[in-house]
Amino acid sequence: MKVLERLGNVGVVPVVVIEDVAQAVPAAGALLRGGVDVMEITLRTPAGLEAIRAAAAGCPDMLVGAGTVTTLAQCKQALEAGAQFIVSPGFDREMVAWCVENGVAVTPGCVTPTEIMAAAALGVNVLKFFPANVYGGLEAMKALSGPFGGVRFIPTGGVDAKNLAEYLAAPFVFAVGGSWLCAKKDIAEGKFGQIEKLAAEARAIALGFELGHVGLNRPDAEDSMAIVEQFNRAFGLAVKPGASSNFAGSAVEVMKSMYLGEHGHIAIKTNSVPRAVDYLKKRGFAADESTAKYKNGALAAIYLTESFGGFAVHLVQK
């Protein structure tokens, strides 16, 4: 999997400031236990480079990147230490061009049309938007996405658990960055359980799992319609005819054939089907690619290969 694809699948990129190299591996481990397997260790402290080296060596499952990289020399040092992606607060043409030429994933900070055009000219279309709260946040990125539709942003600064879902729901947001889930204070005080908890919370918000509907298998269209009409009479759920199934409101789908699942299926809504597929794969639950459905080129629904209590389960984009 490509580095940027992995960042997008996680959805949240912790911005980590390490003062003591000995804290790098415990911090990385806490994030991993919380379900976040990417981290951006900044070069804001003298320990930054060695922290990258320690985390990359000590936690091979963690995708470690370098942040606050402002020069090409720093970029090369970070890569030598084990960084797998480079994040810069601004746009340095020399550094970005070198990264592109050498196949290094880089997300430079770009907040103006001029900077975005300069990055796009080099083939870079995933950009850091920093500080997001100072430069207009979602409204600014939405405006910029008009003329630059091929660009997606990683807003950092002013993003936390309270507004994470709102940011990730925007189609022009690739992922978000932030220090709230791996705070400098928590690292310094050894509160790695708190870091794990915040990482898990952020991951849950990014995925947004919730029950969508329950699907029942029936042998034919006539039987399907009879059941949705029964739900209508009992609960007032509106009858919604469809090509392969009928719905009773939005809660019950009744198939017109004996479809997947011994008893039927359960739909789980999510904020991002691709993120959910990646998340579940890491937990041993595979997706059935033959059932994938796309909308506007994006994966919108897919079944899992495993059944749950006789029910097939499929993911549905909110």
PLM segments and residue spans:
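C-terminal helical cap(s) of enzyme catalytic domains, especially alpha/beta-barrels
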Residues: 99-104, 185-207
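Catalytic beta/alpha-barrel core
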Residues: 15-17, 38-45, 62-70, 75, ...
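Vicinal oxygen chelate
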Residues: 251-256, 281-318
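Glycine-rich phosphate-binding active-site loops on the catalytic face of alpha/beta enzymes
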Residues: 89-95, 128-138, 172-195
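Conserved, mostly hydrophobic/aromatic
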Residues: 14, 31, 78, 127, ...
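Catalytic cores of alpha/beta
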Residues: 27, 71-81, 114-122, 139, ...
